[in-house]
């Protein structure tokens, strides 16, 4: 089984995904990290080489296809980018019969987890001013509005990020007969 987590940036896809995978005994993949490993460059630099976001997703979907089709680790959890249910990604996920789960949280909680990176994907520590916090709250809300229609197309579109309670996802999947009894 392939479980794919989607949501806006910093909603907790990687953190929850790692914990969920560990609990289930599944492999974990962060699609952004896999894309960077595959192409040998940061996502920002890769995007700058391509004409549009669409062409980036077209190229990046090849990495997702490899993850979904790989047989060495048939059970895995994959953290997708916010655009993870759009065009090329959506086709790959549909062909791979993946279970997709959209994670949500309040913009204020997401802002508390916000992380910044340089062009080479190295984390940058940044203390935000009140004006910057207000700006990023607006940006997070705008992302939630923009990506919301795609996230609502996920298999299970409204699982909230509750203080890292990945057990909520397990209970939800069991309740919908997605996890068989053998899963912890």
Regions from the PLM with identified roles:
Residues 97-147:
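A glycine- and Lys/Arg-enriched "phosphate-lid" helix/loop adjacent to the NTP-binding pocket
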Residues 55-99, 103:
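Glycine-rich phosphate-binding loop used to anchor ATP phosphates in small-molecule kinases
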Residues 18, 22-62:
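Conserved substrate/cofactor phosphate-moiety recognition/catalytic segment
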Residues 5:
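Hydrophobic anchor at the beta1->P-loop junction of P-loop NTPases
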Residues 8:
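P-loop (Walker A) phosphate-binding loop of NTP-binding proteins
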Residues 14:
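Walker A/P-loop
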